[in-house]
Each structure stands twice: as C-alpha cells, then as structure tokens.
C-alpha cells in the first residue's frame, strides 16, 4: 500500500493541483481503498500507479547542470571547426571578434542590416552588383564643382548669358510698361 508524501514545496504541491493528494478534498486512505477495490473488478491486471506529489532531489538538479553545460561546449567546438575553412574575403577571418574592427562583407558598419539603409557601395541600389550595369558615383554629389567647371568650358563669359535665346522681360522689371497700356517688344 502506498502512502502519500506530504510535500512542502508550493511549486509542486500548490493549490488547484489535482495530482497532489494532500490538497484533495477526500482523504488519501479512502482513495487508496477505492483503488484496490476497483482493481479487483477487472479480470486482467494492469498496474496503474497513482500520481503522487513528491519533492525533487537537489542532487538531480546539480547532476543535470554539468551535462547541459557540456552540450553547449560541444556545440561551440563544432561551430569553431566549421569556421576553419573560411577565408578573410567574406566577412572577417575565423577566430577574430567583431570588436577587432572587421566590417561585414557588404561594406556596412558592424551590427547593421540591409534594412537599416546602408548601401552596398556608393551609387548602386541595395542588393545589386556591378554587373547589373549601375555606374559607381565618383564620390561627389550631383551638381558639385565638376559641373560648374564644365559650364566654364563652354565659352560663356561673365557678361553673356548662358541661355543664347532672347527672353521676354516681365512687366515687373520695367516700370514704364506698367503705366502704359501698350506692350512693346524687347529690342535686341
């Protein structure tokens, strides 16, 4: 005959746990008697053991910790063995850390992703290669000093306009045209 173990640990024998015998409304001795009479009703014998709330041994917990720590060490060793064949061309060489200053293989700062908005190289959209036909920019924003030097090469001096066609002057510029009702064509 089994005796219920009175557990003092509230994590295993808390209120509302149906498997804890000391928390049930019925008496434990009546429950065991009922179980033995139910077993005699059936012709075949099946060994059913009632669930009993017991305290865990602290020795078991300390025994499990070194094995789980060992599994983590084995996984780390396997990762290190996989990284031995990698060269320095893709990412950083194996055995180095992020704090050593190596950038990722796409040219972004460490710890960033493509979604953060860093381009792979200047002048191309994300996810494209040189073979896709995008020109790599020379490193200057458009409309910078080089564009101004091209205008100087066209041969326009400071006194002449860059636009060779005559332009109509607005009425605001000429005060005389505002007072008179006639519109005079500009003289060339």
Swiss-Prot record:
Q: Which UniProt keywords apply?
A: Isopeptide bond, Phosphoprotein, Ubl conjugation
Similarity field: Belongs to the UPF0461 family.
- The covalently linked position for Glycyl lysine isopeptide (Lys-Gly) (interchain with G-Cter in SUMO2), per the record, is 75, 184
Q: Which Pfam families match?
A: DUF5568
Q: Which Cys-Cys disulphide bridges does the record give?
A: none
Tell me the domain of life. Eukaryota
Basic residues bias (residue ranges): 80-92
**Which residues are annotated as modified residue Phosphoserine in the UniProt record?**
37, 121, 180
Asked if Ubl conjugation is a keyword of the record, the answer is yes
The name under which this protein is listed is UPF0461 protein C5orf24 homolog
Bias (Polar residues) occurs at: 94-107
Where is the region Disordered? 80-141
